[in-house]
Amino acid sequence: MGKYFGTDGFRGEANKTLTVEHAYKVGRFLGWYYGKDHKAKVAIGKDTRRSSYMFEYSLVAGLTASGADVYLLHVTPTPSVSYVVRSEGFDCGIMISASHNPFQDNGIKVINGGGYKLENEVEKLIEDYIDGEIPEIPFAFGENIGKTVDYSMGRHRYIGHLISLATRSFKGIKVGLDLANGSATTVAKGVFDALGAKTYVIHGEPDGVNINSDCGSTHIEQLQKFVVEQGLDIGFAYDGDADRCLAVDELGQVIDGDAILYLCGCYMKERGELRNNTVVTTIMSNLGLYKSLDAKEIGYAKTAVGDKYVFENMMEHGHSIGGEQSGHIIFNKHATTGDGVLTSLKIMEVMLEKKEKISVLLRELKIYPQLLLNIPVVDKKMAKNDPDVMEAAKAVELELGDEGRILVRESGTESVIRVMVEAGSNEVCQKYADNVVVVLRQKGHIKA
């Protein structure tokens, strides 16, 4: 990770650690960098946070001042920006969002011309420019100043693309959607309605501050209750920028990213679509997923946490599906990043083609009890690398053996240490997680 850019772009609290000056300089640099030998063409999307508009204006000012033409997709999912960039010849795209974080935060994700997340070396150049380590970039003058275009059409093309990927009509299927008061509000219902589903929506009225607030994929209990109360066949919950999806079956049971990888991986293998007979996961995936994939004779790869790393592995080895437990799922044939609505459509495809309820299709997946603690710390690197913390984690690992595991890692987006334990029961998970938390507290790492 760099000084400003983490695993998922430049993220921070609006007007504190991420400012309009930062956004302006990002725009200035990108307009110059991509416009050295031609007039750069940049697409911008945003989520529903109040500050997203502020950052949009700053980015536009910086980009156009450097001579780039800017095309505004307005409120739209992150994957739609990737789709528009790669399918319509843009030099790069920018998504203004802090994903699943609360409304006070925001972020700037840059997507290169191939629709992929920006290369680390270019992120480093942007950081150097922000810090004044690169000479001042020249301004454009006269007719060379960039123009700004309303490009809602790009989002509508993305919606049409999603609809075209469905293999069957959804007619008669009752689907619940938790839109997290975020980017999915401009896309998801329209897609499901067009495919014939009976669509029921919650949290679809953004007001600038209610994004992710007790809703969406980080508060899946809301959708669980809704699906059961309304007697729905299935439900889908998205995060603020709709690049991740979790599902709920007809019984109200949560289908997380691991379950989605298992469901779709098995289905793709049956159809001869699982390249290299491999599913790409991250180190946070449940031990039960690996044992269940073993039982189906499906291989797997493990990467660092972040869909960026999942996609890099998929590209390097030619794998066709990968993702994270949190619901970032990448279908390499159709997308270059996690896409929540696309993931929903793929789950629907499995359910309709197999003619079974999702609860039935997942009955052979055995997930270990898992506890994940997010511990706010003073300095996440110092906490993670503290010898006593490492020793406590090692002791737990030895005691669990093959019957569980522990993972202690620093968050890529927050000042947090994540302690994850999997074991045979919730009580055992809590016991071993507490062993590490006690050491973190004793050593003064935990924020007061």
Swiss-Prot record:
Gene3D superfamilies: Alpha-D-Glucose-1,6-Bisphosphate, subunit A, domain 3, Alpha-D-phosphohexomutase, C-terminal domain
GO biological process: carbohydrate metabolic process; peptidoglycan biosynthetic process; UDP-N-acetylglucosamine biosynthetic process
GO cellular component: cytosol
Pfam families the UniProt entry points to: PGM_PMM_I (PF02878), PGM_PMM_II (PF02879), PGM_PMM_III (PF02880), PGM_PMM_IV (PF00408)
PROSITE patterns: PGM_PMM (PS00710)
Modification after translation (UniProt): Activated by phosphorylation.
Protein name per UniProt: Phosphoglucosamine mutase
